[in-house]
Amino acid sequence: AKNELVDKVVKATELAKQMAPDVMIDGEMQADAALVASVGASKAPGSPVAGKANVLIFPSLEVGNISYKLVQRIAGIEAVGPVLQGMAAPINDLSRGCSVSDIVNLVAITVNQAAAK
């Protein structure tokens, strides 16, 4: 697909590959190709991560937020995030619908981010 959001992911992938050449990074690819081996083999043959991706990068905060909330609610799992990276200081965002557990988890991550600075 060709659009502005896809172009953002392509550029981010290229930049990430330059910054971390020893890390297996690939993209842009659809979520099913990134997560399901049989789909990855047909949609992204030759990709080192197709079907076994452990990090997904979204083109915007909004898209990432929608995606993680869908997975959290449909699968009935505990999800922590969104975790923001690349800021001058540790900062993360809590949803108005978050639980006490969500707050504790994200505070712990933010404290670890601050300690690493």
Predicted regions and their residues:
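Glycine-rich, charged/polar anion/phosphate-binding loops
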Residues: 37-45
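Solvent-exposed alpha-helices and their adjacent loops that cap or buttress functional pockets
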Residues: 17-18, 46-51, 82-86
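Glycine/threonine-rich flexible loop motifs
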Residues: 1-6, 66-74
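Alpha-helix capping and helix-loop boundary segments enriched in small/acidic/polar residues
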Residues: 3-4, 44, 94-98
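C-terminal functional extensions of proteins
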Residues: 11, 15, 37, 62, ...
